[in-house]
């Protein structure tokens, strides 16, 4: 039996204070995928998060607010972003920190 092929994505970046920052995460047709967000900053929380998906990478669904785990305190992770039986090309995760922070984002899908 062949091993499944996994799609992976990882990025660490700073969020400027009060600026909504979008991350286009390549899901590339994976049926099941999970995104984990970690606030790697020292003090400031992530204060807002939304997710939208695109079938072909051009048109996106309406952004859905992620409320569970938000605000995301410094040094903690949010692992509730899951696409189950939801194939798409791109997931657009938008994060905001009122005071600025640093985040790491990882995704795996199959």
Where do the language-model regions lie?
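Exposed aromatic-hydrophobic patches
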Residues: 21-25, 77-84
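Transition segment at domain starts
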Residues: 1-29
């Amino acid at each position: 039996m062949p091993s499944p092929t996994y799609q992976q994505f990882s990025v660490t970046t700073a969020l400027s204070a009060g600026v909504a920052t979008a991350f286009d995460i390549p899901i590339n047709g994976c049926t099941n995928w999970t995104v984990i967000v970690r606030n790697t900053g020292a003090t400031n929380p992530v204060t807002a998060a939304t997710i939208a998906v695109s079938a072909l990478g051009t048109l996106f669904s309406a952004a859905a607010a992620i409320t569970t785990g938000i605000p995301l305190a410094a040094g903690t992770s949010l692992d509730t972003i899951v696409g189950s039986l939801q194939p798409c090309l791109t997931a657009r995760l938008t994060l905001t920190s009122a005071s600025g922070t640093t985040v790491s984002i990882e995704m795996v899908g199959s």
